[in-house]
């Protein structure tokens, strides 16, 4: 299974449900499998509150595999020989995307307790900006457990395609 980890940096504002904004943000994400030419084989995986973008596979220096490794991979339920699977780290998470320990561009200091409160729709909005940048306009499925399931529901309501 082909695994790639990448980071996308966004310089635009992300307007949040709370009325606050992030003045730019970063999203780290992993992909599994190969995106086909017309980008019609995408499956989006959304992680739980304590999860990360590392949903499957194992790196040489890791003791355990990604949190859904039993389900994602060549010949598995989410078959990476057929589908291009993408799992982005939620903004606000401590696993590489913009979070309370990130630098606030307006103060040049870590956000810490000044990091804005996020709604599920804020996380989805940030992810949609990532998919737009990658040229992905729809997905075969959006799947997630626990908080990831809440994100999947938000996609179904706010972005049904």
Residue ranges and their predicted role:
Residues 1-42:
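Catalytic-loop region of hydrolases
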Residues 30, 34, 40-102:
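N-terminal cap/lid subdomain of alpha/beta-hydrolase-fold enzymes
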Residues 44-45, 87, 141-143, 154:
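A structural signal for short, well-ordered beta-strand segments and their strand-loop junctions
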Residues 67-72, 112-118:
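A short acidic, glycine-rich active-site loop
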Residues 97-117:
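Short acidic, low-complexity segments enriched in Ser/Thr/Gly/Pro
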Residues 146:
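Catalytic nucleophile serine of serine hydrolases
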């Amino acid at each position: 299974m082909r695994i790639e980890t990448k980071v996308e940096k966004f310089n635009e504002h992300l307007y949040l449900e709370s009325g606050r904004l992030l003045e730019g943000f970063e999203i780290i994400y992993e992909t599994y499998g190969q995106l086909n030419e017309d980008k019609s084989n995408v499956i989006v995986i959304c992680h739980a509150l304590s999860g990360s973008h590392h949903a499957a596979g194992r790196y040489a220096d890791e003791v355990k595999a990604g949190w859904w490794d039993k389900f994602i991979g060549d010949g598995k339920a989410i078959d990476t020989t057929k589908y291009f699977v993408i799992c982005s780290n939620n903004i606000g998470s401590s696993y590489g995307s913009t979070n309370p320990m990130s630098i606030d561009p307006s103060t040049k200091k870590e956000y810490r307790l000044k990091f804005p409160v996020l709604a599920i729709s804020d996380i989805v909005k940030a992810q949609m900006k990532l998919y737009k940048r990658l040229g992905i306009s729809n997905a075969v499925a959006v799947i997630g457990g626990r908080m990831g399931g809440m994100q999947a529901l938000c996609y179904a309501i706010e972005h049904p395609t």
